[in-house]
Amino acid sequence: MTNLLWQKPGVAVDAKIQSFLAGDDVILDREFFLYDIAASKAHAQGLQHIGILSLQELGGLSEQLDLLAADFRSGAFVLDAQYEDCHSAIEARLTERLGDAGRKIHTGRSRNDQILVATRLWLKDKLQRVATLSAEIAKVALDRAQAEAGLPVPGYTHIQRAVVSSAGMWWAGWAEAFIDNAVRADDTVRLVDSNPLGTAAGYGVNLPLDRAHTTAELGFARLLVSPIYAQLSRGKYELAALEALGSATLDLRRIAWDLSLFTSGEFAFVALPAQYTTGSSIMPNKRNPDVIELMRATHASVAAARTEIEQLLSLPSGYHRDLQSSKGAIVHGFGRGLAALELLPALLANLEWRPDKLRAAIDSGMYATDVAVEAAVAGVPFREAYKAAAQAAETAGQGRTPEGSLAARVSPGAAADLQLDVLQARWQALRA
């Protein structure tokens, strides 16, 4: 391992202890490396503004940071176990290439605000991807709701047949859910969009750092003012980001549950594209919906990441090394969550309903609610109408059709009035 940034002269570092301290940081930091480089460039510019670096030194640092980013992207530079973390790797490279200019880059900052700013930039990008994917999923659902508005589908409560519903209603429900998920992700971007660079280890420094410049240069909406809060916000912002992701993966879990049921032989309402299924290693007849099952499992990983960070935050104010573990939680949580969400738009666009199976699952009792409401409209007190309809449920469907039931469902949002124009307007607002 290269020289440790914090190592004191004459003090030997035990290899086992150092391995424990570093953990899997150097692997996780590959996620944050390019963001750390971008923040280092902005920090160097700020140092030049206050006279710590000359224009020549700034030019050399900026050039070498750009080269390091290019080498990392191409694979010419590998962030591996010879470095303690991404911060050490950047400083080692700059010192090797530039000498004292590289040794000056850390003036006025700590690895604490380095990882804070890199993480904030990373979280902004990941949350924007959650918002984009949620909007894509909502658009697929809106398009299919429009195209299949009148397709009868059995509606369930308690996983028991309940009323006549429609594919349009089913799709519209998921469209609105993922519009909300996109809004929540965008709102969370606004929360985390604050610049902690320049807060150092949580108490500021005796330098007039140009924090306004780094805020603008890195594209942050505002300055995170208090160095104390900068440390308090670590974990808190990660938790908020995972909650926004979890809102999307929670709905993903529920839609995957629907599809798990609907693709089973007992329902057979839906056929999945072949590429979303696998076979059995022993049963030649099997076509397993493994993709949607693993989608369903994804929320567990996101929830676990949330729980891990929540437990880490049982701490007093100030920096604590415990917080290092928050990196693994967000990397794993967002890694699993986004990978699953990426697959959902195409899956939803290509699934096929089986209208004959859907119609066969609509039985006479599913019209009983219609009968009760119609009697109430005619003047029968609803509770009496309810009792009468319950007693005659087995014959409630006589003379009725699924299409007739759907056409009568005129309450706003129901099958005859899906209000897709309202949802479309909300979807359009996401892109504004």
Curated annotation (Swiss-Prot):
It catalyses: 2-(N(omega)-L-arginino)succinate = fumarate + L-arginine. InterPro entries: Argininosuccinate_lyase (IPR009049), Fumarase/histidase_N (IPR024083), Fumarate_lyase_CS (IPR020557), Fumarate_lyase_fam (IPR000362), Fumarate_lyase_N (IPR022761), L-Aspartase-like (IPR008948). GO terms for cellular component: cytosol. It holds the Pfam family Lyase_1. Signal peptide: none annotated. Pathway: Amino-acid biosynthesis; L-arginine biosynthesis; L-arginine from L-ornithine and carbamoyl phosphate: step 3/3. Keywords: Amino-acid biosynthesis, Arginine biosynthesis, Cytoplasm, Lyase. One of its GO terms (biological process) is arginine biosynthetic process via ornithine. It is found in: Cytoplasm. It comes from the Bacteria. Coiled coil: none annotated. Its EC number is 4.3.2.1. Gene3D superfamilies: Fumarase/aspartase (C-terminal domain) (1.10.40.30), Fumarase/aspartase (Central domain) (1.20.200.10), Fumarase/aspartase (N-terminal domain) (1.10.275.10). One of its GO terms (molecular function) is argininosuccinate lyase activity. PANTHER family: ARGININOSUCCINATE LYASE (PTHR43814:SF1). Belongs to the lyase 1 family. Argininosuccinate lyase subfamily. This is Argininosuccinate lyase. It comes from Xanthomonas euvesicatoria pv. vesicatoria (strain 85-10) (Xanthomonas campestris pv. vesicatoria).
